[in-house]
Amino acid sequence: MSEDGAQTAEKMDTHTQYYLESLIIDALKGKGFQKIIELFDGKVIFSSQFHNKLLLSQLDKLINKELDRNEFKHVSVLMKCIQHFCKNDCQESSTLIHQGLVSKMVLWFERTVDFLRISKEATLLTLVEDFYDSALVICKCNCEDGKRQLLDSFLIRLGHLVTEKWVACHLRLEALRTINCILDSISREDKKKLHCSEDLCELTKDLARTIQEAGDYDIQVAISEALCRMMGKKFRDSFVHQWFEDNFLADAFKEIKDKEFETDCRKFLNCLNSRHQSNKGVYTFPCITVFTDLDELKKPQDENMENFWIDFNAGSQCVSFYIHNTEGSLWDSVRLLKESVNNYTLKENDGQQMLGIYLKDPQVINTNDVTKVKIYFEPKHDIKSAIKRVFEDINEIHSNPVELDSTEGLIDIGNSLASHTVITTATTFKQWKRNQANKMDSASDILGSQTSEHSSTTKTSSANRSVQKSLSNADSHEIVIESVPLEAVITIADEQPNTAQFQDDMDDAIFQGAASDVPAKDSSQEIIIITEASADKEFAAKKTQGIFQFQGYSDTLASDQVSDAKKKILLPKQSTERATPASRYRASMNSPLQRTSSAYRSHLFCESNEVTSNTESERSWIQDFKNKSAVKSADYSCEKTRNKSKRKVLPLASESGDDEKQVDTTETVARFTSRKEMHRPEDINPKSPHSAELKLPGISALLTPGDSRSQSKSDYRYQSAIDDQDIMDPVEEASSPEMSIDHNKEPKNGHDEVYASGPLNRSVDGNNIYHAADTLQHATGKRKHKTCEREEIPFKPRKLFSSTEKNVNRSAADSEDSEDVFYSESHDQDLAEASVLSAFDSFTKELKRKFLTRYKRIENRANHVLKSSHQQVSTVLNEIHQCRLQKINHFNKIVVHELSSLEAEVQALKQFEKETLDFWEDQYVKMNTFCSSQTQRIKTMDSALLETISNLKNVIQKTTKEEVSNTEEHIQNKLLK
């Protein structure tokens, strides 16, 4: 390759690795989410994705922006992007976590919960579930800091969500399962510190109170498990009296043993529910037996499980019970929700109460599609009150659902048979049992011959299409009936119905008519075409004869019964899951992140190292994604014990990190041998263009659901080989044989691969043709894992990977693109390489163990120092706070006292001012009076003075005149002398 070509390839590879981040930036700029949605829908395939340090801030802005716009679907897509980054590479996830991903998630989750208070949109419910998935992805990353952050912040928020009564039941249950998964993933040291957290102690009290108010048995079990995980046995005994004020309940909770959690928890919850008669939320009764259609269900096989318990949950409005799983050691759960029930009957016969529940759509129970469940109780139990509390709005049928008016087998389903009639042969269940073998052979031959003719019609039919809808099509001259057995259907113009006496229970008449000639499960299936009646008169005459009239029984129920037989006989096997937008249980064929139903809980302590198959039943909702080890971590579920002597009790909460499973050399050799056998040249088309495509690892595992029950034996072999690998590794996933085979096998009918969000089924004939299941699963439907899925290898940091192991993985990926090189390797070379890999694997794990031991010592020392510093700082801050409070209180008292003194002085001054004004007013009056009198006096004195002066003048003048005269006389006298 030239230098320019190498540079161009390097640029293209860099662009591909950062493609998802570029789409997020484009969405932030307002260019939409369509390309990201197509990426996660599987329409675009790319290699491993990376990001820069600015991604978290960009995601924060974009998520808050979309939440402000109420675009919850876009936020779900962004959460899937976060899951992919965390799942794709441990280094990438550590970068996001160290930047504060968990704290951002808590803020986003709180905003989402606030929206959930005022809206119940399906996209909003899905977003809440995506937060659960993101938390699980972080748990599976090999980042202890992320787990610790989840434990400190996100787990508390989930616990508060569980205690809220307004939250939907399935969201609360999924939140509890997420809490238990988080608690199961943390180390033993972190578990020992849980009882020291005040927030967690308060949360345990709230959860214990919620147990008594939940109204659903599964929620009660999940809360009990969470309490047992949060508090060890010795701390549990000290906290239990704070959780339960009733000493009887507290003592009953103490009796729960970790190794017998399921049965002991059943005893405790039965005791708790029986003591709340006034406000009872869960009614629990032992039943005699349970039947689904014609099959009997068995109680879980446990020597401590004495009765077959049926729970009537008033809070979640469902009937639930656990049954024995015939193909695994786990328990299967059956939940009959109110929304999926059409009606029910309750009657007493032969000293037994029979509760019949009729479903709207078929539900998968023990790998069978079921539309009717019959539960038998002893007459002493008050079943009527319990069922009315659960199905309060559903009418009870007091008469038989099906009444036989004559000996004919004519079925009238409402008004949908206005111009068409279906006649079934009158046969009893015993007759069917005697003739089953002969009829099965003939039916298989006929159906097999018709499969090729009507294959296109079969593919377009859906599992939930009712007979009533098919019969009401007046434009067609042919009726496509997919639910009536082949030998039970005849044309009206050719044959008259036979007469027979039905000896069985009238409640089973519908199922005998619809399934009287049920062929074997693996036999060929096809559609039967019945021609229209040629004469209306003949039809009217025959209609008046023996008719099954559905009195008090809805037309929908009748069509559902026939639809049940339809999927049993004439349709290819459809997916057993019905997904709803609000459902938590969206199944993914390769996803390691699923939380399966609590019914399939593993035992708290795994008592067997046996690898059980989970082909047609759901896996335990507590998933251990680490390698199987001799010592397993605590796992709260009950395991079927076929041989008690082989059971082994292991200690609680053993840390899987210190006890990694040692990979056996022979197992490694077998893996390489099986891989080479599966990669034979004749099985792979080397010219297929799909081999050169880039694939985004982890996306198909998360978002491409599937059902593994219909896989052939060859699929099982190469699937087992793939499951031994770490599916989270991009190199191994890109070179998996399953991916190569799926890309290179072309369907016989030439159809392209169908991308669908719903469950997909692989056809029985081996071709990679997927039929989208139309049947919607209810909100509490179960998540299912693929067949014989092995426990996955935990995520490892890149630094702990052996360089030789990385080179082997890269060479395996390169060999997928160039098949000739891969297939040229000899069997001896594979064995030698397997031995080298095994040796390096042992060396790597020993080195990892030493590193982890040293790291944990350093971490414990650092944690101790940090804890001491934190306590000292907290003490100082507390003292400062108390001092500030004292100063503020003292200052407040002084100010109040001074204000009161000032107010008193102001009042005194006002009084003094008033007195002064009054005094001066009096003085002013007196002064004016005095002045007036003085003025008058002065005037009087003036007049007197003037008079005196005038008198004085007169006197002076007289005197003067006399003196002058005397003087003159004297002078004259002297002169005379």
UniProtKB/Swiss-Prot annotation:
Its main location: nucleus. Residues 449-462 have a biased composition (Low complexity). Pfam families: SYCP2_ARLD, SYCP2_SLD. Residues 674-693 have a biased composition (Basic and acidic residues). GO terms for cellular component: condensed chromosome, centromeric region; lateral element; nucleolus. Residues 463-474 have a biased composition (Polar residues). It is found in: Nucleus; Chromosome, Centromere; Nucleus, Nucleolus. It comes from the Eukaryota. Expressed in immature oocytes (at protein level). Expressed in the ovary. Ubiquitinated and gradually degraded by the proteasome during oocyte maturation. Phosphorylated in maturing oocytes, before its degradation. Keywords: Centromere, Chromosome, Nucleus, Phosphoprotein, Ubl conjugation. The keyword Ubl conjugation applies. One of its GO terms (biological process) is meiotic nuclear division. Signal peptide: none annotated. The keyword Phosphoprotein applies. Residues 447-474, 574-593, 642-728, 804-824 are annotated as: Disordered. InterPro entries: SYCP2-like (IPR024835), SYCP2_ARLD (IPR041322), SYCP2_SLD (IPR040560). Belongs to the SYCP2 family. Oocyte-specific protein that localizes to centromeres at the dictyate stage and regulates the survival of primordial oocytes. This is Synaptonemal complex protein 2-like. It comes from Xenopus laevis.
